[in-house]
């Protein structure tokens, strides 16, 4: 009986361990090299990449200064409330989401 309980506990632990290995969110990551993002991140075709173990959200920041548009997309541990702001010619859009690849569009 003790062996059956030990085996059941081991199976449950193994299942939970394997499940946690595949639970990381995948996000589009680009534009992180520029202070305000990069132009190729706006329209580029990027594959979603696995984020860190603590990341729960994908983020997107779009900036338009009246002459060009740049973007930054990546992973985040916290939620970024959706925000659209305009100040003169400069407009920004920020948002986050929590499904794989959701920050692509």
From Swiss-Prot:
The UniProt record lists the keyword Signal: yes
Spans annotated as Disordered: 79-105
Keywords (A to Z) from UniProt: Disulfide bond, Secreted, Signal, Toxin
InterPro entries for the chain: Snake_toxin-like_sf, Toxin/TOLIP
Leader peptide range in chain numbering: 1-24
Modified how: Contains 4 disulfide bonds.
Top-rank taxon, per record: Eukaryota
Protein family: Belongs to the scoloptoxin-05 family.
Protein name: U-scoloptoxin(05)-Sa2a
């Amino acid at each position: 009986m003790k062996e059956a309980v030990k085996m059941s506990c081991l199976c449950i632990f193994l299942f939970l361990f394997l499940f946690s290995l595949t639970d990381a969110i995948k996000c589009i990551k680009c534009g992180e090299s520029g202070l305000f993002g990069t132009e190729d991140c706006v329209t580029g075709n990027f594959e979603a990449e696995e984020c860190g173990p603590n990341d729960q959200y994908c983020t997107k920041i779009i900036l338009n200064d009246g002459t060009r548009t740049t973007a930054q997309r990546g992973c985040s541990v916290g939620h970024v409330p959706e925000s659209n702001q305009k100040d003169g010619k400069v407009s920004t859009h920020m948002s986050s989401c929590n499904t794989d690849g959701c920050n692509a569009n």
